[in-house]
Amino acid sequence: MEDQHSAASELGSSAAPTLPPPPPPPPPPTSPPPSLQQRQQEPTETDDAEDTCSSSSSSSASSECFVSPLEDTSSEDSADTVLPSEPRRDEEEQEEDSPDRYMDADVLQRHLLRQSTILRQVLQEAAPGAAAEAAEAPSVAELSRRLEAALFSPATPPRRQENGTCAPDPRLNFYPVFMLPEALATYLLFFHNQKIPVSCRANRPRADAHWRLPSGTPLPDYPTTDEVYKIFEGLGDEEPACANQDLKERDSVLVELKLDNPRLAVVKQCIAVTHFAYPALALPPKVMSTLMQTLLVRRASPLPDEGETPLEDLLVVSDEQLARWMHTSDPKVLEERRKTVTAACMVTVQLHCMHTFLTSREMVRRLGECLHYMFRQGYVKLASKIANMELSNLVSYLGMLHENRLGQHVLHHTLKHEARRDYVRDTIYLYLVYTWQTAMGVWQQCLEDRNLRALETSLARARQSLWTGFDERTIAQDLAAFLFPTKLVETLQRSLPDFASQSMMHAFRSFVLERSGILPAVCNALPSDFVPTVYRECPPPLWAHCYLLRLANFLMYHCDLAEDTSGEGLFECYCRCNLCAPHRCLATNTALLNEVQAINTFELQRPPKPDGTLPPPFKLTPGLWTSAFLRHFVSEDYHSDRILFYEDVSRPPRVEPSACVITHSAILAQLHDIKKAREEFLLTKGHGVYLDPHTGEELNTAAPSTAHHAAPPEEAHPQQHQHQQQPSHRRRHHRSSYADRVRSELHAYGGATGSSRDPVSGGCSARGTHSRDAARRRGSQQRDQRQLRRQFAQYPRGTGGGGGTGHTDEAIQALLHQQQQQQEHQPAQELRRPQRGS
């Protein structure tokens, strides 16, 4: 996380806008800002407060939607800005008549005042020496760095709320710019306009059938020009809808075919396109410029008096030098070598860097996890239900988290079959493009002149070995070792990929289509429709897009997103991928199911401390379980390099599925038995009708209910008849005292555990009296509880399995084992009483 914050800080420091030093207090305007008037001036009467609120609400709506008042914590400086309030009605009438109303409003003043207040607080929170230096010679870079560090990497971490999120900070009240794809367009060349091949996916209606991946399919690989030396960009065996349709006379490369699905048929009828703005996937321009000038062609710099420089004079490696290195003077061999090196520098090295960055084991796992968040799939759906918090609303950018509560993540369930697969595949393709462009943008910004000089020196030293490499693939691998070293790859992988939502990818999709001249509102085209499906039908400049599209198709099947395999009950959150099954799925992990059923059903309390204070108890809460569950990843049963679902494997998993907090199955089994015995005791020994709090069904038999509600003869049930003759106020008192006794007995019966739900208050109508055995059982259980607490004081506190706070599994196991041994020597075991009674 420190690397993420440092990367974010380094990113923002170079891209941050120019911030002036704190300005002096502005001259008094005709009316102060309503936000300052409302916060700094306390009204003396209620009418004044109402006038202030009304004037604040009647101000510019555009300013109120993105500028929020910041509470002024300074003492003297901020007091200078307090201005007396004046009525704003005359000013509003003047603004209505003014043609430049927006510029006459106080939006800019409020914004500058707010930013200066934040910056002043940042300087006050800094060290005294640093603050003095900044006051003497303030620097824009220093102010930007301090402002960014105080906002995004504060020295004191923000306070966390009960649900795990940070408390709202008014200083961060802005819409995150990283949620808009245009924010990345300033880092490098964002688009690459090129003619659309006729062999694109839109003209391949059977591509979805060819893209189906069976079990055992490995990760896709990238090609080279040595392997794919012929490119076909025609329709092939696809049959057009009109037999006499001439492609040369058409003004669009999209051809209406007989096998087109309904979406593609509508797309081809709506638009006529020949070119498309493909998102740029090249390496940073500074790196590519250094590579070209060092290995291939020098930059031409003609003098004013001279003409163009011949190409032979611009070549870095002349024919004579290349002939000496290759030990041959054959022109065909030399020309073929130049083509190989040029292809390796322009195409293959980019594909190798992309393959290295996106297909490592850790990166594939993170991509799968982010896709589970994006599509609310599998274990993320289960964690959201247990924690009662929508985890799919979280989005991030280089470690900066933001909760986007308006992002949608379930609309893909409205699509079926091929339409669903096309949408999911295109969304993952855009997500890979988004991730790669983010990495290239960070790399481009962090490059310095000394880095480029060091790269140029390294390439110049290895020039002969690169030109005399074995083949195109090995040359590209050697080039990637200089351009994209392992340390750089690991640094970028620590901060990427980011959490994203389908709404962000939809905005990205609209952004790409709009730059291509396609209106998304009337045309349901996808950017992946204009990418070829196979390498032999794709020109080399688009091989990177073809590779990402094939990788997106692999990830769709690898994460089990192609179809909806969920069901009802335990299969509501079922997912077949290795991230979920078998260790994070209730249908395949019995221990995890027992642990979920034990949430909020028990509590272990230690004896008081010597000072009389009670230590915090151990209680399995939904938040504790969710935190441990999200970290419950078993790498031994994860297959990142191929599609291998758990249900398709005959052998058992390498690691036995277990719970994530209470890892010992014996503890979970005994907690489950205690809970079950407690419920059976209430159903069999208690009198009356016990209703399920969720469904309202009767949990016990109907005989006791009928007997209690009927009017039996006096000789058959004298006590009950006598009870019915009691006054109404005594019957109400009797029922309330009975509920209290059952509730107290329920707590005593659980020993060290507490009840998760009170069956009496959850729908119980009880009558009658208790026998003397209930009092004896209650006293016996209370003594056992006190003895258990004294024994529990011998064990130290620790951390529970899975990272949750509480006691260790060994301490819990020892306590429950001692309690079980003591109960085995007692013939009238309390846990078995309900079974004998039933």
From Swiss-Prot:
GO cellular component: host cell; host cell cytoplasm
Segments of skewed composition (Basic and acidic residues): 737-746, 770-787
UniProt cross-references to Pfam families, sorted A to Z: Adeno_100
Highest taxon, organism lineage: Viruses
Induction / repression: Expressed in the late phase of the viral replicative cycle.
Family matches, as InterPro entries: L4
Alphabetized GO MF terms: RNA binding
Biased composition (Pro residues): 18-35
GO biological process, one term: viral translational shunt
Region feature Binding to host EIF4G, mapped onto this chain: 291-353
Modified residues (Phosphotyrosine): 373, 690
Domain RRM: 356-474
Post-translational modification remark: Might be cleaved by the viral protease. Phosphorylated. Tyrosine phosphorylation enhances preferential binding to tripartite leader mRNAs and allows ribosome shunting.
Subcellular location(s) per record: Host cytoplasm
Keyword set includes Flavoprotein: no
Chief site of localization: host cell
Protein family membership: Belongs to the adenoviridae shutoff protein family.
Additional remark text: All late proteins expressed from the major late promoter are produced by alternative splicing and alternative polyadenylation of the same gene giving rise to non-overlapping ORFs. A leader sequence is present in the N-terminus of all these mRNAs and is recognized by the viral shutoff protein to provide expression although conventional translation via ribosome scanning from the cap has been shut off in the host cell.
Subunit-level organization: Monomer. Interacts with hexon protein; this interaction allows chaperoning and trimerization of hexon proteins. Interacts (via N-terminus) with host initiation factor EIF4G (via C-terminus). Interacts (via RRM domain) with viral mRNAs that contain the tripartite leader; this interaction allows ribosome shunting and expression of viral late mRNAs.
Free-text function comment from the UniProt entry: Protein that inhibits host translation while promoting late viral translation by ribosome shunting. Blocks host cap-dependent translation by binding to eIF4G, displacing MKNK1 from cap initiation complexes and preventing EIF4E phosphorylation. Binds to the tripartite leader sequence of viral late mRNAs and recruits host eIF4G, PABPC1/poly-A binding protein and 40S ribosomes subunits on viral mRNAs, allowing ribosome shunting and efficient translation of late viral mRNAs even though conventional translation via ribosome scanning from the cap has been shut off in the host cell.
Name of this chain's protein: Shutoff protein
Gene: L4
